[in-house]
């Protein structure tokens, strides 16, 4: 039986493709069982290289089966088909953070603070459970229809991590969100990598643009070392700028932990942004 026919018998009606990777695509679908719209990630293991099938995919599935957090995407079920395809049925989202910024521009201070507090809480949960994401970026932060609630998604580069000396060597994620040590090919603490990426996400949220020009990747660490600049005339609280500076410290050891980020004074209610 084909995968699409099996999905139909299970009460799913596949719709348009809303995302596509090298070995997978994400489709929107309606579900009789869950009485509404879901997202289904379709992974074609036959087209994928052994490294993906034997290492990265099992890690992703292990994380998705084990995590339970209000700001991490929830998976309803996994459907394996004998033709090599795997269907991951999960929560659907109205949009993502990148689309919201592209559509509306920078996110106002209070809303940005509230959204980032949710992101920080989700990353702290992962790190407390010895898990890392390693691909935090605006596209992987899903938003509710009112753009007030977030869900982290896409754990394709996720793995277990128990901190130093449990270092990573795999280049993961997008260059624009990659920390200096990752770009330089140095064995890195993946938790500190996540923290750096959080800094890039926060900068994009509050400015509407990227902190560093990534058109020349070889020169990117040099620009990162100089620190960030802000668009002229941008109104942004000193507490927010201070947090971004902490997250984007060139030295990994100088960056805060995810727990420290979640407790940062800017994230306390009352700071207007």
UniProtKB/Swiss-Prot annotation:
Tissues of expression: Highly expressed in testis. Expressed at lower levels in colon, small intestine, ovary, prostate, thymus, spleen and peripheral blood leukocytes.
Task: Please state what class of enzyme this protein is.
Answer: transferase
Provide the residue positions that the database annotates as binding ATP: 18-26, 41
Cellular component per GO? axonemal microtubule doublet inner sheath; nucleus; sperm flagellum
Question: SMART domains attached here?
Answer: S_TKc (SM00220)
One of this protein's GO BP terms?
spermatid development
CDD domains for this protein: STKc_TSSK6-like
- What PROSITE patterns is this protein classified in? PROTEIN_KINASE_ATP, PROTEIN_KINASE_DOM, PROTEIN_KINASE_ST
Which cell locations does it reside in? Cytoplasm, Cytoskeleton, Flagellum axoneme; Nucleus
Entry EC number(s): 2.7.11.1
Record's keyword terms, sorted: ATP-binding, Cell projection, Cilium, Cytoplasm, Cytoskeleton, Developmental protein, Differentiation, Flagellum, Kinase, Magnesium, Metal-binding, Nucleotide-binding, Nucleus, Phosphoprotein, Serine/threonine-protein kinase, Spermatogenesis, Transferase, Ubl conjugation
- Reactions catalysed according to its record: L-seryl-[protein] + ATP = O-phospho-L-seryl-[protein] + ADP + H(+); L-threonyl-[protein] + ATP = O-phospho-L-threonyl-[protein] + ADP + H(+)
Task: List, alphabetically, the InterPro entries matched.
Answer: Kinase-like_dom_sf, Prot_kinase_dom, Protein_kinase_ATP_BS, Ser/Thr_kinase_AS, TSSK6_STKc
Q: Which residue ranges does the record assign to the Protein kinase domain?
A: 12-267
Q: Does the keyword Nucleotide-binding apply?
A: yes
What post-translational modification does the entry describe?
Autophosphorylated. Ubiquitinated; HSP90 activity negatively regulates ubiquitination and degradation.
- Which cysteine pairs are covalently linked by disulfides here? none
Query: Matching Pfam families, A to Z?
Result: Pkinase (PF00069)
Active site location: 135
Q: Which cofactor does it need?
A: Mg(2+)
> What domain of life does the native source organism fall in?
Eukaryota
User: Quaternary state and partners of this protein?
Assistant: Microtubule inner protein component of sperm flagellar doublet microtubules. Interacts with HSP90; this interaction stabilizes and activates TSSK6. Interacts with the heat shock proteins HSPCB, HSPA8 and HSPA1A. These interactions appear to be required for TSSK6 kinase activity. Interacts with TSACC; this interaction is direct and recruits TSACC to HSP90, which is essential for kinase activity.
The entry's function note states: Serine/threonine-protein kinase component of the sperm flagellar doublet microtubules. May act as a regulator of sperm motility by mediating phosphorylation of sperm doublet microtubule proteins. Plays a role in DNA condensation during postmeiotic chromatin remodeling and histone-to-protamine transition during spermatogenesis.
Family that this chain belongs to: Belongs to the protein kinase superfamily. CAMK Ser/Thr protein kinase family.
Q: What is the protein name for this chain? A: Testis-specific serine/threonine-protein kinase 6
Organism the protein comes from: Homo sapiens (Human)
